[in-house]
Amino acid sequence: MKRRTVLQQIALFTGGLIIPLSSNSWVSKGLSKNPSQKKLIVVFLRGAIDGLNVVIPYQEDEYYNNRPNIAILPPNEPNGVLDLDGYFGLNPALKDLMPLWKKKQLTFIHGCGLENENRSHFEVQHYMENGTPGNLKNDEGWMNRLLGILSSKNPTQAVNIGSVTPEILRGSIPVANLPREKDNLQKLSTDIPIVNKLFNELYNGNDSLSLAYQEGQKARKIFIKEFENEMVESSKNAPSTSNFVQEVKKMAKLMSGEANTQLGFIDLGQWDTHINQSAQLNRLLMPLGEGLATLALELGNLFNDTTILVMSEFGRTVKENGNKGTDHGSGNLMWILGGNIKGGKFYGQWNTLEKKALFEGRDIPITTDFRQPISNILSTNFDLSPQLINQVFPNFNSKNSLNFISV
């Protein structure tokens, strides 16, 4: 068996930490000279969440005319929206986010999306994750390119919650995957002292494969130390912690602890609500809101240096369909949370829900390229120059700043 095959089997063993191996990784190509203490967490809602039932324009008659069965009632009505600014209201299932809105640590950007309109889940997720719309062949994620700029000798600098590296983090720079299930962080053969000793002796050199093995072992030790209590509970048949609230607690621990994680990614599915949307959305939004509020709380003072970005591939139709659901749309909300956010108000362009103002007479139009808010975050929080931002998002001309971050 080849050395590379052996290492890949170790690295990709489903029971432990996963570190993708690459001959182009930072262990062989050098480090950036742009260190930063700021942190970024991306939460991707796969399936296209209905942003119009997240932040509701309850003052518009067209909202209720188009959604007789699935509209959220105005404030002061049973299960009505939570008023935000006298015009928009928050879905009551997200009540846990209201304190962040009142503290001006939460904002929403209207009409975000992929400017070359596309309603294919696969293609739009691909473009949003690789950051190069129109290029289906590119399989390198924009967060991996960002990691290449920020990279330090830290094997847990970028962490994905999940066992498979998502496209947004794929690339030449190694990232760490933390399995969603606690019992997936079980012992590996390399945890057996005699086996560990043999592998340590075999891969103690300075070649790229040896360095990759060494960094993988270092990262695994950090993870085991950070989640020692959880691993003990798991051995006593503790329930799975794959739910979002528990996952964000792990992420906060990694960012504030020895792992010193700087970039984090979590994805959540089942947002494609074509049928009986109200019940589905309520079931999904409650743990999402609770989890985001928990993440802010668990980060503590570190929340001031952290930006949490919640995004989805596209929005949904303004008009409900015949199955009390909605279909694939265009513009959507981008959610941004953080201690240095100029929150408590909205950004982006909102027109109306009149048919003449909608894209193709049916969708919220895309008025803000999804890369624009991210570029603002990279510029302000990570102090990236336009040239470096262009490395993250090639061929994207960043327009006027949305100015939603305090310097």
Language-model-derived ranges and their functions:
Residues S120-H121, G322-H328:
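Short glycine-biased active-site loop of nucleotidyltransferases that positions the nucleotide triphosphate
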Residues M1-L299, K319, L333-V407:
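Feature for exported/extracytoplasmic and membrane-associated proteins, marking the mature portion
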Residues L292, L299-N323:
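Metal-dependent active-site segment of extracytoplasmic phospho-/sulfohydrolases and closely related
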